[in-house]
Amino acid sequence: KKYNFFLKRYMKYKDFKKIESIVADETLQRLERTPVPTFVTHRTFEIFSRIIAIPKNLGEIPLGGFLFASSQNDVYSLFNLFLKIGRKEDVDSLSAANVLAILAFFKREILRLTKELNDTTPPQSSEEREAAQGLTNVGLFGLIDVISQRQHISTEEAARLPISLVLQFLKIDKNKVLFQRNLNNIYKSKKI
């Protein structure tokens, strides 16, 4: 049976993990909807501390990091990737409410960026679908190769490009394809 818990404001994430399986879904959803903090205090070995700012969005993460993050569901991997908090113990010492709010924010941003990536694909005509027969769907990891060829850079350099810049490249390419299609349709209609 699941229970509704009133979580103490300063409950640590390591303590929350012990009771997570019996926490009601409503409580988890409420925690995930709490405002994302603007920063967290990272304490290393409980001695040194530094303030880490939470980004307003994940548009500036590298393409390779985004692709890695979109395949991850592990709290510690995401905190290491986005906030550079690499030790499990350091994440466990953070407030549970903050960890859950930040994790929900990361997931929302990954979904938003994935949707934006999917929206950059121009719609295919039936003739194009027939000609391509699945050849044009390169997947997320093929995207690095496409960007490296487009920009004439190595795949390592392409993986380091910010996802926001990659989205701009893809939007420009989509607009070029749509423009060319419209132009061809105008030429066809004027010939008849």
Model regions and ranges:
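An amphipathic, hydrophobic-aromatic interaction surface with interspersed Lys/Arg
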Residues: 1-192
